[in-house]
């Protein structure tokens, strides 16, 4: 992902 995986 992008935010905190």
Swiss-Prot record:
<keyword id="KW-0964">Secreted</keyword>
<keyword id="KW-0738">Voltage-gated sodium channel impairing toxin</keyword>
<dbReference type="GO" id="GO:0090729">
    <property type="term" value="F:toxin activity"/>
</dbReference>
<protein>
    <recommendedName>
        <fullName>Venom peptide 8</fullName>
    </recommendedName>
</protein>
<keyword id="KW-0528">Neurotoxin</keyword>
<comment type="function">
    <text>Has a weak inhibitory effect on voltage-gated sodium channel Nav1.2/SCN2A. Weakly inhibits acetylcholine esterase in vitro. Increases interleukin-6 secretion from macrophages in vitro. Has no antifungal, antiviral or cytotoxic activity.</text>
</comment>
<keyword id="KW-0872">Ion channel impairing toxin</keyword>
<keyword id="KW-0800">Toxin</keyword>
<comment type="similarity">
    <text>Belongs to the non-disulfide-bridged peptide (NDBP) superfamily.</text>
</comment>
<dbReference type="GO" id="GO:0005576">
    <property type="term" value="C:extracellular region"/>
</dbReference>
<dbReference type="GO" id="GO:0017080">
    <property type="term" value="F:sodium channel regulator activity"/>
</dbReference>
């Amino acid at each position: 992902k992008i935010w905190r995986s």
